[in-house]
Amino acid sequence: MKHFTQDENKSTMIKLDMNIWQSLINDSSKRKIPRYMHQIWISSVNHEEMYDRFQIAANSCIELHLNYNYTLWTHEKIKSWLTIYYSWFLPIYENYRYDMQRIDAMKYVLLFHFGGIYIDLDLKCKAQDLISAMLPLDKRDNEPDIILHMGAEGISANTDIMAAKRFHPFFKLAVSQLKAANRWFYLYHLTIILSAGPTFLYGIYRQFPFKNVFYYVPNSLLFGKLIECVGGETWHGQDTILISRFMKNKMWSSFMAFALIIILCVIFKILKKARYR
């Protein structure tokens, strides 16, 4: 996938964007991440009402963040907003096969346009002003551009909770790559994580040369102390269970990866011979 590979022209554009960005944030008002909280509920096919446990979790975040602007983005609200502000992105949004892809894609669009913090609906808030609470004291006066917590190294950047300053080049890059990444990857789970989800974002992260703009929240601080999972994973399919077991068993996964490489090499040689007959 292109967003996992180095591209000299893309790298130059990122550097130009960062030069412009850094010239704009000298204003003291830009030192803080906007106090805007985004959550998303999309059920475009079944038109389901939001689950009670998600509503309870959302209420906990609202009650602890009365000084934040809060928006629950629904399918219809997103379409109306995109029509006004990002009409060119509406076909990309509508062409996704799954709602989870739409949710992931909109996380990046909303954080780019508004800035603030995005939180999945299955996360219950346990602290006030999460943006400040995630940061050490020495980073609270001049907050980092982007706050993330990483998944497994080399595989994903978690997207369940993220914070960012408005119009940041990192999320501009992410949004710009969504259309090209929207492909079918043969499995439901792989399609979601590679086309718009955590693995997609990790590819963008690898492309982005300015790693000093990120702050990584330790999972030991985040979970249990600042937020609590109330049971989500509503998007997981049968293949998710298989992939999870595969990843947890290192010996089995290494063997399967090796076997897959051998099979692909054999297929490649067969096709190459057939081509020159």
Q: Which residues are covered by each model-predicted region?
A:
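Glycosyltransferase-associated regions of secretory-pathway enzymes
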Residues: 1-103, 121-277
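Small-residue hinge/turn detector
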Residues: 104-116
